[in-house]
Amino acid sequence: MNTGMNILVVDDSSLTRRAITRIINMIGLDANQIFEAENGKEALKTLKEQNIDLVLADLNMPEMGGIEMIYHMRGDEATRDIPVVVVSTESSTTVIEGLLADGAKDYLHKPFTPEQFREVITQTVGAQKQ
């Protein structure tokens, strides 16, 4: 898959950020650059400074979690159309449905396989290009 995208990985765990970056490279997702942020607050700063095409974000992080970050993104004309895939251990159907209603493009439950990751990202990127 050749997307040439700039991807922002947002998670308070450096191990998770590195694992996601490895999977991006392993599945052949052609990312121009992969940026990292430890929380939603850092992510919003990166979104202002860089041209990001896709955000992969955890929900529960210090300072600002994924839900609040999505609210801020959707309220800002510069970031409102950037797709966000939530990558979390959250399993509540109500929470997941709420995330999708509030602006997340998709949800990926941790732990996940590279194949599951590829499927979700391919669907998200494909929907964004239409």
Predicted segment positions?
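Helix N-cap/capping motif at the beta->alpha junctions
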Residues: E36-K45, G66
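Active-site residues of response regulator receiver
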Residues: D58, S88
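C-terminal output helix
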Residues: F112-I121
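Short amphipathic alpha-helix used as the core "switch/output" element in two-component signaling
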Residues: K45, I67-R80
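Alpha4 helix (beta4-alpha4-beta5 surface) of REC/receiver domains from two-component response regulators
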Residues: E68, S91-D106, E119
